[in-house]
Amino acid sequence: MRGVTLSRSGARRTAIAGGAAATTLLALWAHPPLAGAQSPAAERATAQAIRNIGGERALRNLSSFRLRSTGRTWIFDEGPQPGNSVTPASTFRLTMDYDLRSSGDRVRADYVRNSLGTDRPVSEVIAGRRGFISGVDANGSPAGDKAMTSDRWAAVLREQRLLNPHLILRDVMANPRLATIFPSRSLNGRPHRVLLVRDAVDPLRLYIDARTGRIDRLTTGDHNDNRGDVRTIVDYTGWRSAGSGMRFPRTVTLKQEGQTLHSETRSAVRANAPVSSTRFRFPAGVNATYDRALASRGARTTEWLMTFAHLGFVKDGPATEIAPRVVAPGSTLIQGIPNQSMIVEQQDGIVVVEGALSSPRAEALIAYIRRSFPNKPIRYVTGSHHHADHSGGMRPFVALGARPVVHEVAIPFYQRVFGNKSSRLLRDRLDTSDADANILGVPATGIVTLPDPLRPVQLLAERTEHASTTVLVFVPREGVLFVNGDTYTPGAPAGPGARTLDQTIRANNLAVSWIVGGHGGVVSYAQFQQALAVAPAS
């Protein structure tokens, strides 16, 4: 390739160096073979970018890098109000070793994350196609070791690929046909060449300053179950020497939909730092397996997964386990994962209480409903509040004709969620459906009834600081109340949220027998009252 001239032995070494990324990313999610040689313009842009980070020889000889950084992360759709704003997920300190290997890269990211005012030391460790997590991964959990699921594995690798474009250029140097030239763009008032790099998930665009060769920006796509495909922008500033001829950016910022989700400042970066294999050794008893389908999904929902990991409410894993628990006749709590739903059987159909988490979770629920209640249509799907893990699985039910029922304040938010049918990276039922969402709003005062001759269902608003869009779902025939599970978690100690819940119950004269929720277990109303009696005064 012109501009990056490789000897035969050099080309062989480059192919070996690039093989690690091909093993861990490109080869795992297959694409049709590329045809044709790289154009002269693409060759020039590639050569310019490689020269700026240190040159072809330095990149070819890059065997590892170690960085230390501090930063902050933010998350979509977890704040008190619905909209396009983000709320803080964590602050963090990070020491990371990235070991480039032909048999599959090895990564060890030692974090100290702080999401609820308490430091959580946690390490994400990857060796080839497998990984493990050591430390305190979730808020309130004890320190321990566990296998890393393949979606988290893929998300960790893809995020590091975006934050460190050297990994992308390594692939291009090994296989120049991955890169083509894209029309030039102006960025910050300066002309930039745009190198389009084929990627396992979505094409990567590297913005290269036409005068200096500096890589200033990367753009690509990612997916969010409520927001659909979202544009990801990564900006690099303050390129500095990291030794061995290599240069790395000091500050990296990742944005989606105009909002910053990840910002980090590197205090130290060292290329070709020695890395001990003991740092990647699996703990005794931890056996990770590789799941290709789960990895593919994780790579396409990178920031959704990683921002929840930073927040300390981990959403990794297949989300398909269904564990039914009958609460009362006609009301079945669906457990199996931390985000729960309830199925209410009416005479004329099914009410899905809480379309939680994601489309795969929704599909598992749909399969369960079809097995358990054959020929009964799903008439309604409710959302206890707008937070992503409580609402991300509503779309497939809407595609089947279910009417969504949400707080009236959240209607504009859900209109955007259900109106988006343009996803490419992860298409769900609604993307291929002509169904319209006839949203039913729950007012701030009063009760909305989903009528049925046998088992009507009622919804009413609950005022909480957690989310302005909170609603309760009540089945009066058996006295079953479904709560959001955040402000009060059934079975957990009662806090201020439990007291306001009790006030709402009493103000609306609800004859409650059982309380279940989006998280937690099943408690009787008597047990709830006992928990309130021993709770500290707020």
Predicted features by range, described:
Residues 2-22, 29-30:
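Bacterial N-terminal signal peptides that target proteins for export
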Residues 187-285, 474-476, 483-484, 489-508:
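Gly/Pro-enriched, hydrophobic low-complexity segments
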Residues 38-44, 51, 117-119, 125-204, ...:
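Flexible, processing/modification-adjacent segments and terminal tails
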Residues 325-371, 470-488:
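Conserved beta-strand hairpin/beta-sheet module of binuclear metal-dependent hydrolase folds
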Residues 360-405, 507-513:
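Active-site metal-binding motif and surrounding structural segment of the metallo-beta-lactamase
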Residues 48-51, 55-140, 180-183, 359:
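N-terminal mature ectodomain segment of secretory-pathway/periplasmic proteins
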Residues 502-538:
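Divalent-metal (often Zn2+) His-rich catalytic cores of metallo-beta-lactamase-fold enzymes
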Residues 268-347:
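Zn-dependent metallo-beta-lactamase
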